[in-house]
């Protein structure tokens, strides 16, 4: 039985915790602010994040069923950091990610990393040696419900774009980061045939041949592979993508926005297969790895280069850029 979601956290409490030294940057669009916080320095902001995450995920057909979506990875000395977009006009959170740098990953007794994804995926020795030190894990990406409808909220148009401004800045602050590791999420409510088409298409064009990361219990498609192969007959990604988009629309659906965004972010994205997240509304999680320097040039210019142009001094450091940005307040 689902618990009742907590009431909104008082905006004055939130503002009192979103202090200048936690601000990462301004967004390229909509004049919003990006902050990095943790449970340790911003406990009330974390509660509001948990509230908004649970609302957004329940609406889509997932969620924890608890009063707020917070788990053990959000707390503790080695907790995930929370990257959020803040609307200073409405004093509210637009969306966010949580992340953990590879250098901070801790290993269990079997040599596997203790991550939010560890119950679904097994990490190879090659991944742990050659990728982990240069990787940041991203998870729990969300856009607040009020910002998911572009018809009712003009800032919704750039909500995802704003979040990626934050991710772009991370690659400047942490120059050792070469890869983003995360998950694309699809929900049980999504039409099965459409899901199978999307997953087949992704595997065809982005499949990881090295088994760097593998799902412990891989999701089995309900549509036969021969039937899907007969639909996606092109070698070219763009040509096959047009087929996918047409077929999904014929079913009365759209490709989920985040899935669409990720597959159009980098031509060399690696796909690690799909597993069911049984503790999170049985959502279907597809592991992906994106090389930062192989993202499309347009994306690099918008989300990474714009941050360097605004703050060239950030290139001299690996963390704590706020100490430079706000030095006049020290």
List the predicted regions and their residue ranges.
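Acyl-donor binding region in acyl/amide transferases
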Residues: 64, 68, 104-268
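Long, low-complexity, charge-dense
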Residues: 1-3, 9, 26, 319-330
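C-terminal non-catalytic accessory extensions
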Residues: 284-330
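Conserved N-terminal entry element of GNAT/NAT acetyltransferase domains
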Residues: 2-40
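Short, flexible loop/turn elements at secondary-structure junctions
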Residues: 38-41, 87-89, 98-103, 140-142, ...
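Short amphipathic alpha-helix that is part of the acyltransferase structural core
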Residues: 26-71, 75, 81-101
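Aromatic sugar-binding interfaces of carbohydrate-active proteins
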Residues: 257-264, 269-290
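A short helix-loop-beta-strand connector motif used in the catalytic cores of GNAT acetyltransferases and
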Residues: 74-84, 107, 269-270, 280-286, ...
């Amino acid at each position: 039985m689902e618990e009742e979601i907590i009431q909104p956290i008082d905006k004055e409490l939130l503002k009192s915790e979103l202090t200048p030294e936690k601000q990462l940057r301004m967004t390229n669009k909509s004049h919003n602010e990006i902050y990095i916080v943790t449970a340790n320095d911003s406990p009330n902001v974390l509660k509001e994040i948990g509230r908004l995450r649970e609302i957004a995920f329940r609406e889509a057909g997932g969620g924890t069923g608890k009063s707020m979506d917070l788990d053990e990875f959000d707390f503790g000395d080695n907790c995930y950091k929370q990257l959020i977009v803040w609307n200073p006009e409405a004093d509210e959170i637009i969306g966010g990610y949580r992340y953990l740098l590879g250098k901070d990953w801790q290993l269990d007794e079997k040599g596997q990393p203790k991550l939010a994804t560890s119950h679904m995926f097994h990490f190879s020795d090659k991944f742990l040696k050659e990728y982990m030190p240069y990787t940041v894990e991203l998870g729990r990406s969300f856009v607040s419900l009020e910002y998911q409808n572009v018809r009712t909220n003009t800032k919704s148009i750039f909500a995802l774009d704003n979040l990626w401004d934050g991710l772009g800045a991370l690659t400047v602050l942490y120059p050792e980061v070469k890869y983003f590791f995360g998950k694309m999420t699809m929900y049980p409510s999504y039409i099965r045939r459409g899901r199978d088409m999307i997953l087949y298409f992704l595997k065809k064009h982005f499949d990881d041949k090295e088994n760097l990361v593998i799902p412990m219990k891989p999701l089995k498609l309900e549509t036969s592979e021969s039937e899907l192969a007969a639909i996606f007959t092109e070698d070219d990604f763009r040509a096959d993508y047009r087929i996918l988009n047409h077929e999904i629309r014929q079913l009365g659906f759209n490709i989920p926005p985040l899935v669409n965004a990720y597959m159009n972010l980098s031509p060399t994205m690696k796909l690690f297969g799909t597993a069911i997240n049984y503790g999170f509304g049985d959502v279907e999680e597809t592991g992906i790895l994106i090389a930062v320097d192989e993202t499309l040039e347009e994306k690099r210019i918008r989300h990474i280069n714009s941050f360097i142009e605004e703050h060239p001094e950030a290139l001299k450091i690996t963390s704590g850029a706020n100490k430079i940005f706000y030095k006049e307040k020290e």
